[in-house]
């Protein structure tokens, strides 16, 4: 993989991980169960994206 692609993947991975943390922080803060569950599902989805980016990075 070229340096540009690697840089993009690393940036995307970092962004996904930060988003997971952000969504989980919101889920911990809100009292409404439906909203909390929605943010937890969104965090899990973002974590799945991070796993894919990590997979692509491991293929260098």
Regions found by a protein language model. Give the residues of each.
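Non-heme di-metal
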Residues: 1-60
């Amino acid at each position: 993989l070229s340096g540009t692609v690697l840089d993009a993947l690393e940036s995307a991975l970092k962004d996904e991980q930060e988003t997971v943390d952000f969504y989980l922080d919101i889920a911990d803060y809100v009292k409404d169960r439906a909203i909390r569950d929605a943010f937890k599902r969104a965090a899990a989805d973002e974590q799945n994206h991070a796993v894919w980016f990590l997979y692509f990075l491991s293929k260098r």
